[in-house]
């Protein structure tokens, strides 16, 4: 009976057999998409040669679809409570595998549209745009001319049917949509706590297992932003008749090399560059901010535009009081782990048009990017590196490891911090490095059952010199003969090769996981 119950979802009328997704799910293996010309030109994630460490490949999806088509495996959709516990866990594993397959299928139409946008706008694919730091040079250039910024959380639908409705525009195959609804319904029976008012938190912290929900949520966000940008173009139509945008490669999926981490970037950073400089929009980690130049009334209007759009078009509840409006000159904006604000003392740039002509003084406010010291200390406290007031303590859980491993772990943390917060003053990180350095010494002293003073006297102070030499190693690659290189030693440095250290922006798992970073 179970087989007959669910078999109707796999029976498609002949008129639907020409649909795009039908041969992928029911007739052919999914690896046929690797031969699609449009996907291969830009290096699609589907055609990457993934290794064993990635734990997922097209071969796994191929086997999954083959097993789905076998009659004996229709019983995986059954949720009989009398089944053995081991079999129920096996069913959950099947649902997770189906989720990965559905995410791959649903992503294809969206990826094709993104590739067409690249071709139409003649955007050259740049590896630097994949870096988390790539947005900060843009902010330095644009926010210095703006006055106000509005920040808040993007509301999310409380019912998963809204996510299914959002994907209808991209997928015309009704059988796939029915299968998607069936998947949601059956999985909610396995985990009654899944569908709750914490949907967005669930999506953030269950990145690897439930990629289908990540795909659907990204499509839902894309629909929101499409209407927002349409309204924006109508408002600024007389100022700019054409609006171009720069869409990062990690907008919809994270990195091509990491298929298992397709949505590990948690919706990624979306950077839209408008010709009109009076409004800029950015989205990150389920949050947004609007920056504008002019009076507070203008940014307030956009705030209520967003609220009405969410409530009237997408039927999601948004609280206007949770959307904050601040002045850039008086308040700092917490953005991707930095506290960004405009400096109180504007810089003066003196320019001269031609020789022997008069000089022109131009004033420009400088964007200050500071490190949230108290947030980092709080994260260190949760990771058991220090107490509430910032006094270093030993790490007992690491005391059983070899001395070299303990030192390497602490040095790795300092390197991550130095790389990510290279855009701020190096003096600001000294306190954090000091805490980690003493925590390392206390951990080693605890292991050898000695005091910190005796341990350092016996081994010498040069034991931990690696903690403060990372920046010198990087900057030593730049010759110091020119005046430009001299300024690099004093100014901020943005690394455009940080592709996967997203935990740094939220201070979660920062001190346990080393980011995937290419060599500088």
Curated annotation (Swiss-Prot):
Gene Ontology molecular function: any one:
RNA binding
| GO-annotated biological processes | mRNA processing; RNA splicing; tRNA processing
User: Which InterPro entries does UniProt cross-reference here?
Assistant: Domain_X, Maturase_MatK, Maturase_MatK_N
Its chief place of residence is plastid
Keywords on record: Chloroplast, mRNA processing, Plastid, RNA-binding, tRNA processing
Protein's cellular compartments? Plastid, Chloroplast
This protein is called what?
Maturase K
> From what organism does this protein derive?
Linum perenne
């Amino acid at each position: 009976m179970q087989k007959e119950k669910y078999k109707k979802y796999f029976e498609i009328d002949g008129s639907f057999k020409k649909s795009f997704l039908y041969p992928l799910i029911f007739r052919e293996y999914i690896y046929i998409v690797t031969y699609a010309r449009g996907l291969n030109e830009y290096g699609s994630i589907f055609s990457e040669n993934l290794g064993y460490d990635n734990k997922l490949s097209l071969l796994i999806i191929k086997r999954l679809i083959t097993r789905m088509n076998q009659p004996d495996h229709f019983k995986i959709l059954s949720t009989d409570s009398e089944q053995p516990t081991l079999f129920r866990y096996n069913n959950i594993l099947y649902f997770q595998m189906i989720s990965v397959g559905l995410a791959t299928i649903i992503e294809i139409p969206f990826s094709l549209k993104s590739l067409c946008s690249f071709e139409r706008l003649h955007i050259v694919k740049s590896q630097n745009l994949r870096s988390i730091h790539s947005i900060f040079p843009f902010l330095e250039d644009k926010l210095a001319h703006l006055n106000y910024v509005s920040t808040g959380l993007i509301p999310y639908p409380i019912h998963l049917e809204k996510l299914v409705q959002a994907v209808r525009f991209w997928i015309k195959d009704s059988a796939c949509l029915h299968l998607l609804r069936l998947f949601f319904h059956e999985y909610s029976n396995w985990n009654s706590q899944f569908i709750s008012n914490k949907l967005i938190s669930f999506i953030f912290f269950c990145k690897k297992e439930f990629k289908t929900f990540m795909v659907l949520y990204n499509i839902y966000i894309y629909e929101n932003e499409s209407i927002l940008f349409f309204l924006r173009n109508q408002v600024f139509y007389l100022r700019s008749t054409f609006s171009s945008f720069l869409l990062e490669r990690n907008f919809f999926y994270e990195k091509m090399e990491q298929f298992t981490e397709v949505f590990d970037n948690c919706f990624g950073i979306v950077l839209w560059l408008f010709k009109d400089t009076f409004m800029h929009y950015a989205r990150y980690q389920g949050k947004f901010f609007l920056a504008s130049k002019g009076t507070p009334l203008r940014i307030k209007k956009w705030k209520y535009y967003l609220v009405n759009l969410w409530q009237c078009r997408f039927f999601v509840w948004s609280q206007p009081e949770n959307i904050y409006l601040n002045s850039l000159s008086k308040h700092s904006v917490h953005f991707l782990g930095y506290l960004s604000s405009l400096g109180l003392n504007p810089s003066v740039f003196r320019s001269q048009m031609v020789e022997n002509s008069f000089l022109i003084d131009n004033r420009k406010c400088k964007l200050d990017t500071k490190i949230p010291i108290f947030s980092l200390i709080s994260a260190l406290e949760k990771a058991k590196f220090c107490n509430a007031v910032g006094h270093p303590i030993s790490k007992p859980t690491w005391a059983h490891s070899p001395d070299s491993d303990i030192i390497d772990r602490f040095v790795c943390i300092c390197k991550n911090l130095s790389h990510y917060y290279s855009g701020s003053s190096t003096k600001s990180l000294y306190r954090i490095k000091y805490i980690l350095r003493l925590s390392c010494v206390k951990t080693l002293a605890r292991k050898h059952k000695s005091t910190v003073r005796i341990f350092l006297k016996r081994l010498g102070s040069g034991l931990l010199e690696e903690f403060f030499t990372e920046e010198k190693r990087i900057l030593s690659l730049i010759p110091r003969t020119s005046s430009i290189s001299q300024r690099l030693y004093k100014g901020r440095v943005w690394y455009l090769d940080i592709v996967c250290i997203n935990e740094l922006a939220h201070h979660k798992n920062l001190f346990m996981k080393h980011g995937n970073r290419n060599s500088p």
